[in-house]
């Protein structure tokens, strides 16, 4: 298990062992407890970004489907019905994509935030990898929000604290990589003898522009997304389970 701190305070978790589910879920819970105050009761909205009809883009929706949603139970029946004295109020939404709704995701979430007034928004999305080594092997947690679609050049309005007026945590996993990155990584060892500027010039000449719009995903993406989404949802459930005294 490898942990590293990346720019914008993004925490990455990489693992090469297939039997990592429980360990990674615990790490996700620990990191979430570090970036948000879960010592007191919070109202938390979890947003599953992406298109559930496209496997590589369905990470967010699958995470929300596996969450322990509690807000409605607490509102209707009170904490006693759940046998708890304290509990976070968890709600979830799968907003779909603009082609399905005709609305920006940010518009939908802004409306929900204005109506339900959560303390924190957690947004989960599939990402585009900048390296083939990170594909399906890195979980990024950031406290600076998330920009839906930006990894594949489909720039939408970001889900950030500035836009929503509440703290936004972003969680992402790179599930696709563009063809140009595959070519770049494949040729990297061959070009080690060249200076960095020469490498860049050579690759720009070699890589056709259309390769930057062609995205590739592993053949086992169905099973991988199912596994990753369950691992993340269990991490969230663990993080939300206990509240300090």
Locate the predicted segments by residue:
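A structural-propensity feature for long, helix-poor, extended segments
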Residues: 81-112
């Amino acid at each position: 298990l490898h942990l590293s701190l990346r720019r914008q305070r993004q925490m990455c978790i990489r693992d090469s062992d297939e039997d990592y589910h429980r360990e990674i879920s615990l790490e996700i819970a620990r990191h979430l407890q570090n970036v948000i105050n879960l010592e007191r009761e919070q109202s938390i909205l979890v947003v599953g970004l992406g298109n559930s009809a496209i496997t590589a883009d369905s990470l967010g929706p699958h995470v929300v489907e596996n969450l322990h949603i509690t807000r409605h139970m607490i509102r209707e029946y009170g904490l006693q019905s759940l046998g708890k004295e304290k509990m976070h109020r968890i709600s979830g939404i799968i907003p779909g994509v603009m082609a399905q709704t005709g609305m920006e995701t940010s518009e939908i979430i802004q409306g929900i935030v204005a109506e339900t007034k959560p303390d924190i928004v957690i947004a989960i999305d599939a990402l585009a990898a900048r390296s083939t080594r990170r594909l399906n092997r890195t979980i990024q947690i950031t406290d600076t929000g998330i920009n839906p679609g930006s990894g594949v050049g489909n720039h939408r309005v970001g889900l950030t604290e500035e836009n929503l007026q509440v703290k936004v945590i972003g969680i992402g996993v790179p599930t696709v990589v563009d063809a140009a990155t595959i070519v770049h990584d494949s040729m990297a060892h061959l070009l080690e003898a060249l200076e960095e500027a020469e490498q860049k010039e050579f690759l720009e000449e070699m890589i056709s522009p259309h390769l930057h719009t062609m995205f590739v995903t592993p053949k086992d993406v169905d099973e991988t997304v199912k596994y990753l989404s369950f691992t993340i949802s269990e991490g969230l459930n663990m993080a939300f389970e206990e509240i300090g005294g």
